Amino acid sequence: MRHVPEPVEPDAPLPAGDTDAAYPVNEQHLEDFQVGGVERSLPPAEQLAQLVSYMKNSYPVPADDDALDRYLAALPDRLTHAAMLMLGSGLDHTMPGVAYGMDVDARELPELPELGARVFVPTDTSAGRWAVSLNPGFGPRAVEHHWRPLIAAIAQLSGTTIIDLPDPRDRDVAAVLDVAAKQRPSTTAIIATQHEPPDGFALISAAALVEPSPDYSAAVIGHPGTCGIIATPEEYRRIVRDIADRLRA
């Protein structure tokens, strides 16, 4: 049984920082660097600045595709570690897969085993919702350790059975949608960053999980076009909750 520690609540709420105030970045090379952050609650933009500084100095983004795949696969754990170090242990730094997706039943798709699809079944399937999620361009390791835990969290929060397709070619998408249709779902959606859904299928955008959006406090990884974002675990959870809400709507 996996032990998931409960988030530690501070004895008293940390004083909130003023959004317009000047906040020096708590960088490791500075003499006044404080392990665990500082005694104040930073605004989201300043929390992000702390994480970006740490990630850029500690984990340079590789150019090689295989190395980038490994980098993105390790990103959830690294962001949790960075948030604990830079923002303090009094906040909840669990990523969505751990916070929401631990009770999801993950299984193979027996109808199409050759596709490598994974089915995420939430604990409550009474709504009869189904969806197909399309990998936005991650390599195989990042699909398994970064993307799919996010999909599991969305499945659990929304009460939607989700089939994740790692290589979303058009003919494979059509085949998986056909499998979903045979389950007689109440609704069927496609979760993707960019895709033209067939008639009768809603498109639920997952773009905020892989590229910065004005609606969330997130930064690019490396250079524009790299699949993935730097954001606090709290912001990742907010993005996942919003996607789940759109599936339920």
Residues of each region from the PLM?
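Primarily recognizes the serine-hydrolase "nucleophile elbow" in alpha/beta-hydrolase
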Residues: 174-219
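Short, surface-exposed "cap/lid" segments of acyl-processing enzymes
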Residues: 120-159
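A glycine/proline-hinged amphipathic helix-loop "lid/cap" segment
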Residues: 1-116
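Active-site catalytic motif of lipid deacylating hydrolases and related acyltransferases
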Residues: 147, 155-179
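Acidic, polar-rich N-terminal leader regions of halophilic archaeal proteins
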Residues: 93-110, 117-134, 197-206, 237
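Conserved beta-strand scaffold positions in the cores of enzyme catalytic domains, especially
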Residues: 117-119, 131, 162-164, 209, ...
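Alpha/beta hydrolase fold serine-hydrolase catalytic domain that processes acyl esters and thioesters
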Residues: 200-249
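A structural signal for the main folded, soluble domain(s) of proteins
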Residues: 42-55, 121-123, 173-182, 195-199, ...
